[in-house]
Amino acid sequence: PFDAPGVIKGQGTIGTEINRQLKDIHAVFVPVGGGGLISGVAAYFTQVAPHTKIIGVEPYGAASMTLSLYEGHRVKLENVDTFADGVAVALVGEYTFAKCQELIDGMVLVRNDGISAAIKDVYDEGRNILETSGAVAIAGAAAYCEFYNIKNENIVAIASGANMDFSKLHKVTELAELGSDNEALLATFMIEQPGSFKTFAKLVGSMNITEVTYRFTSERKEALVLYRVDVDEKSDLEEMIKKLNSSNMKTFNFSHNELVAEHIKHLVGGSASISDEIFGEFIFPEKAGTLSTFLEAFSPRWNITLCRYRDQGDINGNVLVGFQVPQSEMDEFKSQADGLGYPYELDNSNEAFNIVVAE
């Protein structure tokens, strides 16, 4: 429906409402799914206030319009992140794409933690809880104004969408503090000996630890600490990490590594040295029996070395899985994975795999 001229005209009336309530607007930020809303708003402001910038906002994992504008033609995404499901569109409309090429001033991409931080900001300000797609434009406006140091200008962000899905709240709260840089997610390795954890706590000092997972790793004779701390000043965090590293406690900042935030921080068993181990993230519909069907496709043919899954209240679920697959069988494995029809990505390049999970 977003590619119909009548629908676009109807959505364009939002521009009329904005213009009635506020004049001399520097920029209007619009969430982009199929492109109907931004096409209508841009068409209106081009006629009545051409000085106002119209900027679209998409999640990194659903950037179909951004990629299409960059390539100069419509591009269909193979995988679409459904965290902000209201704007999770694989292919933008033909008519809306042409309108965006002609009328809009740019696009901004936002991470899921930035969207979550925007939801928290709106709640703190007015006790309203937006759904994820409804907060996309606010996250984009905040990122844009920070990057370009825009102050003392009238900025509008369109908060579209319905009500928050209750089952998604826990993930939003997990990501919100990280997205606003009010918390940091860290991993520290320390030599395991009596008193070492106490020394670690002293080095963290006055920074408040809001979550901690501590696990002795016998193969390395080291303990792994995964933890979150409140951050008032970025310089304080940097100084703390510097003190830990100089005390032979190697520390990594994973604050904006969504793989760690979503999966790896829950894997407290330490690292393992497993030959031919590969890791993959698979996306499949959240319905009864899907996980069992997924696992049956690989086991016992290939040994499953790791599995982490949690219902997030999305249309689709995200599961992190480890497999033992000899290089000689990789083509066969990929063929089996392709046959399932679920989007997936095999990726051992994320530094968190090698630091926290793999030996």
UniProtKB/Swiss-Prot annotation:
Tissue spec. comment: Floral buds of untreated plants. After ABA treatment or mechanical wounding is mostly accumulated in leaves, to a lesser extent in stems, but not in roots. Expressed in anthers, carpel leaves, pith cells, sepals and petals. Not expressed in stomium, vascular bundles, epidermal cells or pollen mother cells.
EC number: 4.3.1.19
Keywords: Amino-acid biosynthesis, Branched-chain amino acid biosynthesis, Chloroplast, Isoleucine biosynthesis, Lyase, Plastid, Pyridoxal phosphate, Repeat, Stress response
Pfam families, per the entry: PALP, Thr_dehydrat_C
Up-regulation conditions: By abscisic acid (ABA), jasmonic acid (JA) and wounding.
S-S bonds: none
Subcellular location: Plastid, Chloroplast
One Gene Ontology biological process: isoleucine biosynthetic process
GO molecular function terms listed in the Swiss-Prot or TrEMBL record: pyridoxal phosphate binding; threonine deaminase activity
Catalytic activity: L-threonine = 2-oxobutanoate + NH4(+)
Domain ACT-like: 184-256, 278-349
CDD domains xref list: ACT_ThrD-I_2
SUPFAM superfamilies xref list: ACT-like, Tryptophan synthase beta subunit-like PLP-dependent enzymes
GO cellular component, one term: chloroplast
Family the UniProt entry places it in: Belongs to the serine/threonine dehydratase family.
Assembly: Homotetramer.
Protein name as it appears in the record: Threonine dehydratase biosynthetic, chloroplastic
Organism the protein comes from: Solanum tuberosum
Gene this chain is encoded by: TD
